[in-house]
Amino acid sequence: MKYDLEFLENYWMPFTSNRDFKADPRLVVRGEGVYMYSQEGERILDGSSGLFCCAAGHSRPEIAEAVYAQLKEAAYVPPFQLSQPLAFELARRVSQLTPDGLDHIFFVNSGSEAVDTAMKVAYAYHYARGEGQRQRFVSRERAYHGVNMAGVSLSGMIKNRQVFGPGIPGVVHMRHTWLPENRFVKGQPETGIELADDLERIAMNYGPDTIAACVV
């Protein structure tokens, strides 16, 4: 099936060259297990589980039935000063899978939102301890940490940052550990050992008591 430009016009796709995509659109119409299927019937291996959020696969009847059962009860219960029992049950189950000490669960909708939330937790944690001056975050060049403003600021991918202004203040990037001269080296490389101390270098430069977290 061919779609004209008018049909494709209104959806502004994220992380995509919209003009190029709409000139030659590739649309998925269904999924089953680890595969997705295009409108032409082409089978595509979903090797990244969607955006890492379909780990159980596509078109699982038991998941669809559970979602439908919940939608018949309530489509959404806001979590601000209110909740519903299944949220607590899910948090309890997740906490049984995590290491000791990591037993409080905060639900978010995406990895990008998780990074934003983690930064807020770090800010609030240090503020509560009387160390509100800890407002600097250390990340790494070429890192990717999401599409929200906090994630873009932490990310070290130039093309993902250059059109979005200065970003969140107080973000410092460690140098990337990949060096061209080490690409074919076997064993311990002879160059780049100083990069292992980059976090310490940054801490000493700005002051260890100004750093809120290191994001890796």
List PLM regions with ranges.
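Active-site-adjacent loop/helix segments that line or gate small-molecule/cofactor pockets in enzymes
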Residues: 1-32, 82, 195
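Generic secondary-structure signature for well-ordered alpha-helical cores
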Residues: 13, 68-76, 95-99, 127, ...
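Electropositive phosphate-/nucleotide-binding environments in soluble metabolic enzymes
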Residues: 26-30, 57, 61, 84, ...
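Short coil/turn connectors at secondary-structure junctions
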Residues: 40, 100-103, 132-135, 149, ...
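Glycine-rich loop-to-alpha-helix module at the N-terminal edge of alpha/beta enzyme cores
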Residues: 43-131, 138
